[in-house]
């Protein structure tokens, strides 16, 4: 069930909200949310609800064991030393990564073994469960936080179930860290201010997805997949670039739109998830970009992989090795395809170069910092080419499209396809470019200053009405677009 589907907007969401707020007490509300979340998942994956329940039960058990092995008042545990706790973590990782590996990578491994060694192994043909990359990572987060003493283990399996399966973040994130919402599972206090802020966030996310991402998806698909050219090598340089830029905008508004909707839904039920995006396309370096893009995944790998491997505490060579491990895993996390592996290693190269420059050539590293526009242009060039690799069906398509972008095939500079797409989508392109900028925080800061100088009555009320009118218009336009049956799937549902 998609957040941007009629079934969700007109059926599941209003019914769930109504029942939730009619129920008395935190316990009943939590149980209902878990039941609603399992129904939400079963709507698209009825068979894999059993896999979800196995993931919940397994991580609940590993969490209890992690808490037990931390106890210092049990003499027989002291005699065993740290090994039971470590073995428990190894088994937990094997359990979660085993689930992820079998369903996500089995076909990829079999295919590569057959091609490399001339084998005839049968492809298991397993269907990828929606959201498995997210809920397995959340399960690991829960157990690791308990193991580290950063959170208390839950005695009730239903509480762990709610954390893992809560429907706003279940399908495509953000990856919610257990220690960030542990207290809110049974100690949150819903209020109308949070609810209203959640509705605002949800509408903004819906607008990003339906009004912007879906339109750019159509541009990217037509050109990337060669539907507009008899011979893809005839694609003009400008057309190749407009396809790459369209996908760059599509994936941002698609994924950040989903994240906004997830954060908004969480707020409606009293949960405060950490933001997942912070205007990544204004970044002045590749390192800065990854501090702003998919922040829940970046921080997960930082805290659970990079730092345990030694982080920045060891010498530069070891830091580079740690960085390599993180970005190899990041690429694989996104999918069972060599394009994702290369995409991860592509970013590793740039991040490693930036790290080396900061350590060994600080003056060179500071040059881009002194010229923000230059730093942003270089970063966006790296990002756009990276998205071409990410979007391509295979490495040959990625190499071909990048070659077309730089005219290495002798393809023309421009053509009628580029001209048509620019004229047809000029308004969306302009709106998207503005929406990528952090204008809203600047506007809020300016309004705060005006409130101080002129008083809230002079500024806050009329601008508040204007904001509400804009949100209402955005909602109506999004619903109208959905009524037309426009392009709708979320990109990160595939991961």
What annotation goes with each model-predicted range?
Residues 1-494:
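Membrane-embedded transmembrane alpha-helical bundles that form the catalytic cores
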